[in-house]
Structure formats: C-alpha cells, structure tokens
Amino acid sequence: GEIVDVALLGDIPLHDAEGVAREVLALVPFRQVVERGFACHDDAAPLRCLVVGERHSLSLADALAQLPTDRIPLEDAGFDIDDEAYADIVRRVIADEIGRGEGANFVIRRDYVAQVGSDPLTAGFTWFRALLEHERGAYWTFLVSTPDHLAVGASPEAHVSAQGGVVTMNPISGTFRHPAGGATAETLTEFLSSTKETEELFMVVDEELKMMSAVCSDGGRITGPHLKEMSRLTHTEYMLRGTSTMDPRDILRETMFAPTVTGSPMQNACTVIARHEQSPRGYYSGVAALFTPRAGGGHDLDAPILIRTAYVVDGRLRVPVGATLVRHSDPYGEGGET
C-alpha cells in the first residue's frame, strides 16, 4: 500500500479523492496526545498511515514455514536507565506526585536498547516468528515495516474498538509473573489479594469509564474482572462496552491514551510523564489503529495499544517498558516488573 504521514487524527485518509472508502492502518505516536491539550516530549514521531492496496491471508503454518529462524546478534544491550536510577525515579514520583495529590497512579517507562547485528527486516521477521510460536494470549501479534522504521510486537491489550457502532475498551492491569514451576492456586490467590494490584485495576477502569461516557450515548457497561493468561504473565482485566455514532477517528482522539500505560487522571499523568521520563516515548503507549470500511458505510476501528513492542531505527533496537506506580509501590519491585 501507500505510506502517508499526516498531522492530525482527523487527517487519516479514510476516503480517496472520489470519496471511496479505504482501509487504513495508522501508527499513532504518543505525541498525538497534544490534540487533547496534554503535555508530552515532542519527538516529531510521525502519525504514519498505510493505505492498504492489497491484502493477503496465510495460515499460521504457512507463515511459519516462510519466516526466518536466524540468530540475531545484539551488541551493547541493556537498559538506558539502570535499576538504581529507575528506583530513584519511582521514589520521586511517589513522594512528589502521588504524595502531593497529583494522581493515584502513573506509568513511568525505561528502554531496553541494543545495536542489531543483522539486517533489520530479517531481525524483525525472526522476532515475529518467535512471537507467533511462543506467545499466547496476545490481542495482536504484528510486524509493521515502513521506510526507516520497523515495529514488531505482541500487544495483550485492545485500547478501543468500534464495530458496527459498538465501542469496546479493555483495561488490563495487575501483573503476575509466573514462577519457574508455573502458577498455582496459592500464588494466584496471593496475586489477587494484593492491595497494589487491586488499586491499579480499579483506577484504570474508573478512568476508562470516563472516556466511554465521552464517546458513548449510553455511557457503557462493565463486565469482569477476568484473568488474562499469557505465556509468562497473567493480568487482570475488565471489558467495557457502549454504543456510539461518532467518527472512529474522533473516538480514538477522545480516548487518547490508555490509563494502563499513562496513569490517572489522564491530563496530570501526561504532565508527570513529561516531568520524570528522560526522553520522548515515540510510539510507546500509542496505538496501531486499523480502520476497515463497513458494507453499509463508515468504518470499523480496531486499535491495540503499542506495548510489548520492539522498534528498530537505523539499526538500533529499542524496547520501551513501563510499570504502574501507586502509593504502595516498591521502587525495586517496579524495576523488576519492567
């Protein structure tokens, strides 16, 4: 398809010059949050649109048969912020932001970085294969390659979707890392009894209900909580659903971005992120938004959050990872979560 960079969500080209509806995949960077008047480190990451020209389908078996299994060497690998420095940031956020009433929870990231010692596209397809084979419970497993930029990941979380007028949000929070022998009833019960994990989930659900009320005429309905099991982690989640007649681009704008990867309240969270994170987020915590034409007119929207995603630019690998900080957070424990 054709690659088009646009300035605003409303500029995403859902129709051609003759008004014919088109399918578009948009990579929405975190910096688009300025459309809501919120703060951010502006890194000029483009709102990049792939206007779909052709679509092909493969079975998983056929895809795996064609994807490479190369060993991808990484050099100078490690976190850009070490454990002690990250723990210091956590302490400051708890004391200076949460302790002074700026909000109840904030997500602060650091980046795992390395130099990729092979062709970036080969590396991306190799990692994509590994995710297809070994990760489970992902909402989207994807690779997006555009000029000078590659993204590959397995996002567990749908931020927002709009299918036939039904809007769905899926807040996921709380993270249980499976022990070496696997999860047991006892370890899961301990996780579910954690005050910190419970606070995280309730706070993000409350914030997303506010978003639903802004885009849905009926305000939305809530179901859950549920457990979401992945290959090495288990999360807690809720499902929120409501109805809306809004343009899907407007739905996306009014729900930027998920409190599960920013914090709450949303505006304060963006200010705290700008104050305490040392570099721009790029696409981390943004979305990959797929707009698909409906037979009766309009477009459906499917927008997973861009987390659990690796980016390669100019041969440099970056994997942004964050932890949700609440008043009960342990600074070193949050570093371990990343």
Where are these regions (language model features)?
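Short, flexible beta-strand-to-coil junctions
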Residues: 1, 28-33, 144-148, 290
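Non-catalytic accessory segments adjacent to catalytic cores
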Residues: 2-122, 164, 197-199, 217, ...
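Short conserved micro-motifs at the rims of enzyme active sites and ligand-binding pockets
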Residues: 37-39, 180-181, 215-216, 329-332
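Contiguous alpha-helical scaffold segments within structured protein domains
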Residues: 54-80, 115, 176, 183-274
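Conserved phosphate/anionic-ligand binding catalytic regions in large, soluble enzymes, centered on
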Residues: 97, 102, 201-213, 282-285
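Short coil/turn segments at secondary-structure boundaries
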Residues: 104-109, 140-146, 250-251, 266-268, ...
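An anion-binding catalytic pocket shared by soluble metabolic enzymes
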Residues: 107-199, 214, 220, 291-321
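Conserved hydrophobic core element of enzyme catalytic domains
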Residues: 241-337
